[in-house]
Curated annotation (Swiss-Prot):
It comes from the Bacteria. Homodecamer; pentamer of dimers. Its EC number is 2.1.2.11. It comes from Mycolicibacterium vanbaalenii (strain DSM 7251 / JCM 13017 / BCRC 16820 / KCTC 9966 / NRRL B-24157 / PYR-1). Binds 1 Mg(2+) ion per subunit. This is 3-methyl-2-oxobutanoate hydroxymethyltransferase. The keyword Magnesium applies. It holds the Pfam family Pantoate_transf. The gene is panB. It is found in: Cytoplasm.
Length: 280
């Protein structure tokens, strides 16, 4: 006869975490399970987000703004993004890591897109790429997907096209809604495994999410999308000044970092640091 534990049932061993793959995202959509995506740009931050069990990390071309200090995402290059992606991949062993293809690296056609995506995966270890546009980049998505590289699409407001769109404006209002729907269907048919919808009216995003079999990832697209994404500095309160309407701050990391830096500088100036316990 087997022995029974004296004080209650034995605790079950925790299940090992599973590496997130694209098929998990499709399964979650079918089950109605919503998930979160965050940007990440370095090893240390990626490790924190992986510990927080964020399933998908995006090394976005938003690095142009929050890492390199550009006003838009247009100037950032492939060579500038690749080292960032490497760090994120190393820091997040469980997350699906998606790497943005920067402006100018895929628009010329399918062959350019495939060459850029191939280089990105070979040199970084990323698991998927993201590119902006709907029907106009369907051929690029098809070529990259056919080569076995998962593609996340991006429709609605596309930051790389900010100059052509006349600034940061909501997309898909009025007559433009039909084109946004066409874009969503086009990227799905081209082989995208998911699609980001940015600054799209919530009602339209709900309609598109219901039409597609692939997950929709909202950023300023209302609550009905299958997932949500934010730039981590916006989410955690790292950035100063005015943020977009769709941003909610879940922390005050910037304030805490400033406090820590000020305390450190003060203790160095007064001789309080390093103390005996910090010395050999």
């Amino acid at each position: 006869m087997s022995e029974q534990p004296v004080y209650g049932a034995a605790a079950e061993a925790p299940k090992p975490r599973v590496k997130v793959r694209t098929h998990h995202l499709h399964k979650w959509k079918a089950e109605g399970h919503k998930w979160a995506m965050l940007t990440a740009y370095d090893y240390s931050t990626a490790a924190v987000f992986d510990e927080a069990e964020i399933p998908v990390l995006l090394v976005g071309d938003s690095a142009a703004n929050v890492v390199y200090g550009y006003d838009t995402t247009v100037p950032v290059t492939l060579d500038e993004l690749i080292p960032l992606v490497r760090g994120v991949v190393r820091g997040a062993p469980h997350a699906l890591v998606v790497a943005d293809l920067p402006f100018g690296s895929y628009e010329a056609g399918p062959q350019q897109a495939l060459a850029t995506a191939t280089r990105m995966l070979k040199e970084t270890g990323a698991h998927a790429v993201k590119l902006e546009g709907g029907e106009r980049v369907a051929d690029q998505i098809a070529a990259v997907s056919a080569a076995g590289i998962p593609v996340m699409a991006h429709i609605g407001f596309t930051p790389q096209s900010v100059n052509g769109l006349g600034g940061f404006r909501v997309q898909g209002r009025g007559d433009a809604a039909e084109q946004t729907i066409h874009d969503a269907i086009a990227v799905q048919e081209a082989g995208a495994f998911a699609v980001v919808m940015e600054m799209v009216p919530a009602e339209l995003a709900t309609q598109i999410t219901g039409k597609l079999t692939i997950p929709t990832v909202g950023i300023g697209a209302g609550p009905s999308c299958d997932a949500q994404v934010l730039v981590w500095q916006d989410m955690a309160g790292m950035t100063n000044g005015k943020t977009a309407k769709f941003v909610k701050r879940f922390g005050a990391v910037g304030d805490e970092l400033r406090r820590a830096a000020s305390d450190y500088a003060r203790e160095v100036a007064t001789g309080a640091f390093p103390a005996d316990e910090h010395s050999y």
